[in-house]
């Protein structure tokens, strides 16, 4: 067999504890080191704006799931899977009811998940947690138009920007701003 990524289902909020427990199984030789190679909690960076302050936080984008890179043996796969399933907080492997060998995630899907988590090369810029709707009233908190209010005309989420119609001298003027420069009213 070759190394493949599998998805381990856990109780939500127990991901870090389960990750440590799986690493301990390998460290204490309950599972051979040539079977489990890596384990990841799929997280992404988000920029939150709270009380006018920006901060970058880590958020799980698949709560209750871990990615485990394994080379499951053809013969003794049940032993390995049962050891992992015995960990408190583990529900089981995705694609396996317990009697069948777990299904590996396709290489493309694993690459996309790891890329989104920033584990492999790709866009690692923090995503903005705040979203706006067209027509929503906002206040500009940063930049030359700070303290002005306006109405959202367009949301460009892929560029983390928003176009706001600001009334200056009695005329609505469109202004393109970063998402972190505005807050909802």
Curated annotation (Swiss-Prot):
InterPro entries: KOW, NGN, NGN-like_dom, NGN_dom_sf, NusG-like, Rib_uL2_dom2, Transcrpt_antiterm_NusG, Transcrpt_antiterm_NusG_bac_CS. It holds the Pfam family NusG. Signal peptide: none annotated. One of its GO terms (biological process) is transcription elongation-coupled chromatin remodeling. Keywords: Transcription, Transcription antitermination, Transcription regulation, Transcription termination. One of its GO terms (cellular component) is cytosol. It comes from the Bacteria. The keyword Nucleotide-binding does not apply. SMART domains: KOW, NGN. Residues 134-163 form the KOW domain. Participates in transcription elongation, termination and antitermination. Belongs to the NusG family. This is Transcription termination/antitermination protein NusG. It comes from Treponema pallidum (strain Nichols). The gene is nusG.
């Amino acid at each position: 067999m070759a190394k493949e990524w599998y998805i381990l289902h856990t109780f939500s909020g127990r991901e870090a504890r389960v990750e440590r427990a799986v690493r301990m199984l390998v460290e204490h030789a309950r599972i051979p080191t040539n079977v489990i190679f890596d384990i990841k909690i799929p997280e992404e960076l988000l920029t939150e704006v709270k009380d006018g302050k920006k901060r970058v936080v880590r958020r799980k984008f698949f709560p209750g799931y871990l990615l485990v890179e394994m080379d499951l043996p053809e013969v003794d796969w049940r032993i390995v899977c049962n050891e992992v399933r015995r960990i408190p907080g583990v529900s089981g492997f995705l694609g396996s009811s317990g009697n069948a060998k777990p299904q590996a995630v396709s290489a493309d899907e694993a690459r996309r998940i790891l890329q989104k988590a920033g584990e492999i090369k790709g866009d690692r810029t923090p995503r903005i947690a705040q979203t706006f709707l067209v027509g929503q009233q906002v206040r500009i908190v940063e930049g030359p138009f700070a303290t002005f209010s306006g109405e959202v005309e367009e949301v460009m989420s892929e560029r983390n920007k928003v176009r706001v119609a600001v009334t200056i001298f009695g005329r609505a003027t469109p202004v393109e701003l970063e998402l972190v420069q505005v807050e909802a009213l």
